[in-house]
Curated annotation (Swiss-Prot):
It comes from the Eukaryota. Residues 41-76 are annotated as: Disordered. Pfam families: MINDY-3_4_CD. Belongs to the MINDY deubiquitinase family. FAM188 subfamily. This is Inactive ubiquitin carboxyl-terminal hydrolase MINDY-4B. The gene is MINDY4B. InterPro entries: MINDY-3/4_CD, MINY3/4. GO terms for molecular function: cysteine-type deubiquitinase activity; K48-linked deubiquitinase activity.
Length: 460
């Protein structure tokens, strides 16, 4: 009898615990939904623009999946990992975003007005490695959709530091020894240059977050408590835009700044909706694409950063599609180029092959898409692509953006080696070297190249 009473008491206690656990889970669910749509209003973490940023959600895909209104979800461990955005005064002199502008912005990005940027997009910003380190000139990049934008901007940062800033020689030492101030100047110059090119060298538009809200929720528009607080600032001179960005750089490089989203917004408004409609074609009606439960940037976004025009394709000029529709490619050579290689790509698909406009840029810097991962290749010799003799034997430097990479990788490219020398080189390092994706990407530009990793074990 005593055992039966004891068992009943234990069973009752177990049911009570299960009920409590169920209620806690229920409350946690709604707390996460509420926090997601308020951009973390319970967030009490102060901004720390110089400290380390540790992701509280290492297992999330990070590609930018957003949820329809009322269904946003973030892991509870990530609720306090993003500080509030850097907010400027509403009296700074810009003009506020309207409901019509916010609606068009959502439509051109997602194809609807319901989706919003998720946690991993919101936490993405422009942060350099430590000054005076070997990777001082490189950005720390995350995973997912924002990564491609960060790496594309990285190309423009290298362009500024190596080739366009005044008073500095084009050598690797100047890259690796830059100070914090030089990092900030490089980022401001890179962002301003990209926006100016997108504005057809006529106007740049910069978006910043203010303290006031200008757009209310409607049945057709879901608020995110971020986009609705934008002010837009227009500049008719590139230098003025660069100074403004430099003066408000914390809005792009500060932890919690949503810096990558702000830059993407600025890019779209600089290009204008009218120009974007002319740039795009029937294959691309929106700038972000669903992928593996998230959102990634379409080629049009990368081409807009590289060339100023949101061309949806990588071939030269215009081509005719399968249904005789006109497809838009790249019209002019850009300063920073583009290479791509994928293990599943078909060499017979001419529309997917990168054209010479992107393969042979004005400067020896390339954004690389290798099996869907973005990286940078560059050469410190400005004459590489303008003097054919320079292309016989030269060095390229490779930055993968992976946290495991602690220093630049120097690759020596030999385009005139004999076939038996190339075979011997490949056999020496085994089949892993022979099929390195990095090498395959390089060979889309220099097809017969022998590539020496100079002691580094081939990776990527």
């Amino acid at each position: 009898m005593d055992m039966e009473v004891l068992g009943q008491e234990q069973s009752s206690e177990q049911l009570d615990l299960e009920e409590i656990s169920r209620k806690i889970s229920f409350l946690d669910k709604w707390r996460e939904i509420f926090s997601y749509h308020r951009l973390g209003t319970n967030n009490s973490t102060p901004q720390n623009h110089e400290g380390n940023h540790t992701s509280a959600d290492e297992n999330e895909d990070g590609t930018g999946l957003s949820q329809p209104k009322g269904q946003g979800h973030l892991p509870s461990s990530g609720l306090c990992s993003i500080p509030n955005p850097s907010i400027i005064s509403s009296k700074l002199g810009g003009f506020p975003i309207s409901l019509a502008m916010a609606t068009k912005l959502r439509q051109i990005l997602f194809g609807n007005t319901v989706h919003v940027f998720s946690y991993n997009w919101k936490k993405a910003y422009f942060r350099f490695h430590d000054p005076s380190s070997e990777l001082a000139f490189t950005l720390e990049v995350g995973k997912g959709g924002a990564r491609s934008i960060q790496m594309a901007v990285q190309g423009s940062i290298i362009k500024y530091l190596l080739f366009t800033r005044k008073g500095k020689d084009c050598n690797l030492g100047n890259l690796c020894e830059i100070s914090k101030k030089e990092q900030e100047q490089a980022l401001a110059a890179a962002l301003a240059g990209i926006l100016w090119a997108a504005g057809a060298a006529q106007k740049a538009t910069i978006c910043l977050v203010t303290e006031d809200i200008y757009v209310a929720s409607t049945p057709d528009y879901s608020v995110d408590n971020f986009t609705e607080r934008l002010q837009l600032f227009e500049f008719l001179e590139k230098e003025a835009a660069e100074k403004f960005i430099y003066d408000h750089l914390l809005c792009f490089r500060g932890e919690g700044s949503h810096g990558v989203i702000l830059f993407l917004y600025s890019l779209i408004f600089s290009r204008t909706f009218e120009r974007l409609q002319m740039d795009l074609d029937v294959t691309t009606t929106q700038l972000l694409q669903p992928n593996a439960g998230g959102f990634l940037c379409r080629q049009a976004v990368l081409n807009m950063i590289l060339t100023g025009r949101a061309s949806p394709n990588v071939f030269n000029g215009c081509e005719e599609g399968k249904s005789q529709e006109t497809l838009h490619g790249v019209l002019t050579r850009s300063d920073v180029g583009y290479l791509q290689w994928g293990k599943d790509a078909s060499e017979d698909d001419r529309l997917s092959q990168v054209g010479s406009m992107l393969k042979t840029p004005k400067l020896p810097i390339w954004l690389c898409n290798i099996n869907g991962n973005y990286s940078i290749l560059f050469c410190t010799n400005r004459q590489l692509l303008s003097d054919w003799k320079m292309e016989r034997l030269f060095d390229l430097y490779f930055y993968s953006g992976q946290p495991s990479q602690k220093k630049l990788v120097r690759l020596t490219i030999d385009t005139h080696s004999h076939h038996w020398e190339r075979d011997q080189q490949e056999e020496k390092h085994g089949p892993r070297r022979r099929f390195s994706p990095v090498e395959m990407a390089i060979r889309t530009k220099w097809s017969e190249a022998t590539i020496n990793w100079n002691g580094t074990v081939p990776f990527f």
